[in-house]
């Protein structure tokens, strides 16, 4: 996933319409709404939110001050803002569900938005709902502290011309987990035999940002580790099945790297770098958190429709479906916001099914809807002539999914922030310790973290 560095701001469009009868009764036009929004991978994503907020601004007469910034910067600045008490009214953070919200909710730093959720409660995907509930240690209960806007799960992106150059077709790609990823090592060997300096696997393996952790945890689930944290919030790392899954996931991700099937630089990749390596045809395939790779090439018809393959999560080695981990990109309202009523009014408008669907379509469908009615009523999402979107919808919305584990216990947000599993991979690839040793060290650190987060 890529983040850019530009900022946008929209000014008021309809000050003269402040007395409009269409203004929401809960909004005071004299009070502007300050919004921070995560920057998109391409300009269409930024334009989509600018247009939506401008329309709400015009309808209500309430000025919106919008700042669009890259994801990591947004989280860093919001944490600092919450510490000094000078916060925006509304925030959309693509990775906030993992790296920000769980501990902010724990510390009672977010506004409960259950009343906003309730306006569309029957519309939301069940896993998206689970992914929006977090535990408040002060109140000793779970509540909705975010409003789901869009979601995603891991996808596989493959260059068809490269597998064909190696002598294979789409039908040759195996369906089960280990066989699937091993296939690209075979493709790698065949391309190298032809003198091509191309890597079979584009694994993100850096101890930073989000993609590496996403990849590890999908491998963890594929090997039976989905119960690493129980719904009660209890850490379950002493379970034999989970223990084995952690070791196997580490071994299966690091061994291809050590054998040269993954680019050496992958240990330093940020979230954009696997995309760039794919576009440069340095790698045959890469797991990616959205279909951003394909969507970014939409204007290049041959690449979008013929050359880039989007595939869902492989079956488990037992031939059974592996649940996807559904990441929910949320909106939230920090405590201390100056215009909470207007922020909630804006959110209620934004998540009306037709509004939310139109926004996601204007972003080119990089992320999935969080409302099942959108995919059922709008053929855009399951159009069989599009080789990417309907695969993403099937993987993330119609097949089994699970929430991230920080929805059960915010301690797991700290696990992700500290990059514990990615650091374990680095210890294997760079310090030559065994997967068993790396897993043992990681488990010890995780247990220490969980001691700080007791669910009542």
In which residue ranges do the predicted regions lie?
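N-terminal export signals
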Residues: 2, 8-27
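Glycine-centered hinge/linker elements that transmit conformational signals in sensory
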Residues: 182-188, 230-267, 309, 313
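Short, solvent-exposed loop/beta-turn-alpha elements that line the ligand-binding surface or hinge
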Residues: 112-127, 173, 192-193, 203-206, ...
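Hinge/lid segment of periplasmic solute-binding proteins
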Residues: 95-155, 212-215, 309-313, 383, ...
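Extracytoplasmic/periplasmic solute-binding protein
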Residues: 136-149, 154, 181-235, 283
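Conserved C-terminal helix/tail region of periplasmic/extracytoplasmic solute-binding proteins
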Residues: 31-33, 63-64, 164, 189, ...
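Extracytoplasmic "Venus flytrap"/periplasmic binding protein-like
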Residues: 51-131, 164-167, 172-175, 276-277, ...
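C-terminal lobe and pocket-closing loops
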Residues: 291-304, 317-419
């Amino acid at each position: 996933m890529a983040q850019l560095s530009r900022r946008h701001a929209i000014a008021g469009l309809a000050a003269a319409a402040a007395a409009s009868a269409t203004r929401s009764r809960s909004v005071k036009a004299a009070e502007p709404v300050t919004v921070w929004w995560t920057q998109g991978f391409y300009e269409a994503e930024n334009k989509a939110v600018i247009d939506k907020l401008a329309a709400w601004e015009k309808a209500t007469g309430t000025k919106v001050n919008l700042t669009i910034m890259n994801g990591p910067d947004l989280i860093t600045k919001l944490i600092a803002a919450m510490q000094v008490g000078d916060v925006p009214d509304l925030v959309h953070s693509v990775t906030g569900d993992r790296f920000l919200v769980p501990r902010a909710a724990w510390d009672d730093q977010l506004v409960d938005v259950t009343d906003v959720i309730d306006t569309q409660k029957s519309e939301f995907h069940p896993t998206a709902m689970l992914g929006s509930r977090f535990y408040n240690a002060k109140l000793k209960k779970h509540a909705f502290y975010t409003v789901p806007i869009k979601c995603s799960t891991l996808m596989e992106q493959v260059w068809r011309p490269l597998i064909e150059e190696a002598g294979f077709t789409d039908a040759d790609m195996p369906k089960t987990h280990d066989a699937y990823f091993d296939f690209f090592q075979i493709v790698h060997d065949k391309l190298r035999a032809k003198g091509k300096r191309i890597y079979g696997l584009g694994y993100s393996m850096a101890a930073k940002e989000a993609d590496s952790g996403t990849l590890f945890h999908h491998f963890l689930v594929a090997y039976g580790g989905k119960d690493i944290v129980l719904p009660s919030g209890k850490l379950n790392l002493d379970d034999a099945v989970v223990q084995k899954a952690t070791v196997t996931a580490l071994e299966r991700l690091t061994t291809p790297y050590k054998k040269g099937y993954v680019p050496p630089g992958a240990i330093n990749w940020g979230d954009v770098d696997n995309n760039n390596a794919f576009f440069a045809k340095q790698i045959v395939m890469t797991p990616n958190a959205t279909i951003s790779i394909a969507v970014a090439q939409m204007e290049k018809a041959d690449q979008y429709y013929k050359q880039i393959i989007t595939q869902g999560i492989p079956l488990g080695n037992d031939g059974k479906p592996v649940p996807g981990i559904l990441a929910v990109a949320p909106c939230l309202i920090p405590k201390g916001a100056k215009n909470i009523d207007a922020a909630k009014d804006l959110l209620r408008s934004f998540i009306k099914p037709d509004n939310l669907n139109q926004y996601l379509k204007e972003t080119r469908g990089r992320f999935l809807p969080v409302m099942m009615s959108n995919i059922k009523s709008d053929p855009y999402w399951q159009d069989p002539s599009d080789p990417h979107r309907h695969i993403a919808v099937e993987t993330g919305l119609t097949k089994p999914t699970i929430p991230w584990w920080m929805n059960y216990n915010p301690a797991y947000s700290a696990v992700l922030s500290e990059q514990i599993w990615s650091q374990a991979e680095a210890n294997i690839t760079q310090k030559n310790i065994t997967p068993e040793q790396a897993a043992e060290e990681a488990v010890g650190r995780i247990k220490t973290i969980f001691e700080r987060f007791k669910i009542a």
